Amino acid sequence: MRNGTIRYPGSDAAPGPDEMSAILRRCGIRLAPARIGQLWTYHQLLREFNPELNLTRIHNFANMVLKLYVDSLLPMNLVELPSPLMDLGTGPGMPGIPIKIAMPELEIVLAESRQKRAAFLKMAVERLKLEKVEVVGKSVGSSFEVPVKGVITRAVESVGATLERIAGCLDRDGLAIFMKGPQCDAEIGEALKRFRGEYRLWRDIHYTIPHTRNERRLVVFQRLGPPTRIRKETAMKRHGFRKIESENNDLYRDIRKLLTSRGIRKQQRALVSGSKQVHETLRDFPDDCLAWIAPGQEMPPPEGAPGHMSWYQMAPALFETLDVFGTRTPLLLIKVGEIETWDPVEGFPAGCSVLVPFQDPENVGAVIRSAAAFGAVQVILLRESAHPFHPKALRASGGAVLRMKLRNGPPLENLPENLPILPLSAEGRDITRHVFPAAFGLLPGLEGPGLPDNWRRKSFAIPICKDVESLNAATAAAIALYAWSRSGSQTKHSPAPA
């Protein structure tokens, strides 16, 4: 090797199988002469069809051996490759064909959606006389259900996108093997967060292609749960399921009404959205879960979901209407119990009770989340308030709506002035200098108009820069709750995670 370039015997002449074998051996890869012959035939096919099909941009012989064949074969020295193994987005057949040549006992699935390349793969498999090789000439998505024990890919698609793509085919305990460059920490982190509980990071191996400066990283995820096809079969036996394909379906119409406070009040049901909140609700409140709502049948309920829960398989367009936040993940239909009424005559228990007049459901959810985070004893929803189980409120609360003690209160105008209530208004006194009572109500103002004059006169404020007129009402309430929680006068109440 000189100046990073491998020199092989007879390099002034046209290279042949012996020169290919020499480079492979120097990289720690030893193949029998018959295997070298197959790899040489494959190399010749690449060279022959490359002008027509643009199979590779690498043309120098030594670089082709190093960056294509050695790169394809090194993973078999780093991890035990499972069988059947699918090469996803294989292009001209890498790493799948070199791996198959080196490990003839392995069953290989070559997946390539581009038809001309798929045709090349079929021809190459025939010319090389490779057995137990299947060419899949279409795009692989979550509905692809041919079972495999492993998936390997050199494609540039993100780890998370690929894990979603192979949901239907990779078996439980199967390996998803990613041949990456060195800078892939962000996509690994995103995938671990997104697929928590479904996959674990099994191996993360940094290496370099021998005799080059090309850094590589073999990132291997192991599947913890069953593939979609098994989950579907199990879920269909465990859960009653209904297909809903028309917007005129009565059940769909009822569910669509849950996008409004009125519908929630009337039906005493609500929709939970977002993968994290949905799975936490399933885990913590299984008895309240009524139905799993998903687009079609490709996202079945998870293992361990309560058996009484139904599975509604929505037509994609109908699901999109319900998925108001565009999560593209299943929704959860839950029952909402009666919210107990608070009578001002009973006053406030020890600690802070948050009085909520907000008409914006996002503000309602945000203040409930803050109340839970800072240990408020209860949230009293005044008559003006939006419903706490409105989809926007549920989402903004981070699930705190399900955990916080909620009460229904009177209209703002009917609040007795003799109660120990701390109103919040921009013109009030500095609340950070106030000594909080042992039991009191915190009253932020309505969005826009704020508080009535009788409450403004005795109000407290969050000190802010003079250049800023005011804070968002839910933000002001959160800061006031923080000030109370740090004041030393807080009656300890178990706060929920923020």
Curated annotation (Swiss-Prot):
Its main location: cytoplasm. Residues 1-230 are annotated as: Methyltransferase G. InterPro entries: Alpha/beta_knot_MTases (IPR029028), rRNA_ssu_MeTfrase_G (IPR003682), SAM-dependent_MTases_sf (IPR029063), SpoU_MeTrfase (IPR001537), tRNA_m1G_MTases_N (IPR029026). The keyword Methyltransferase applies. It is an enzyme of class 2 (transferase). Keywords: Cytoplasm, Methyltransferase, rRNA processing, S-adenosyl-L-methionine, Transferase. S-adenosyl-L-methionine binds at G89, M94, R154. It catalyses: guanosine(527) in 16S rRNA + S-adenosyl-L-methionine = N(7)-methylguanosine(527) in 16S rRNA + S-adenosyl-L-homocysteine. One of its GO terms (cellular component) is cytosol. Pfam families: GidB, SpoU_methylase. Signal peptide: none annotated. In the N-terminal section; belongs to the methyltransferase superfamily. RNA methyltransferase RsmG family. Its EC number is 2.1.1.170. One of its GO terms (molecular function) is rRNA (guanine-N7-)-methyltransferase activity. Specifically methylates the N7 position of guanine in position 527 of 16S rRNA. This is Ribosomal RNA small subunit methyltransferase G 2. Transmembrane segments: none annotated. CDD domains: SpoU-like_rRNA-MTase (cd18095). It comes from Syntrophobacter fumaroxidans (strain DSM 10017 / MPOB). HAMAP family: 16SrRNA_methyltr_G. It is found in: Cytoplasm. Residues 231-498 are annotated as: Methyltransferase TrmH family.
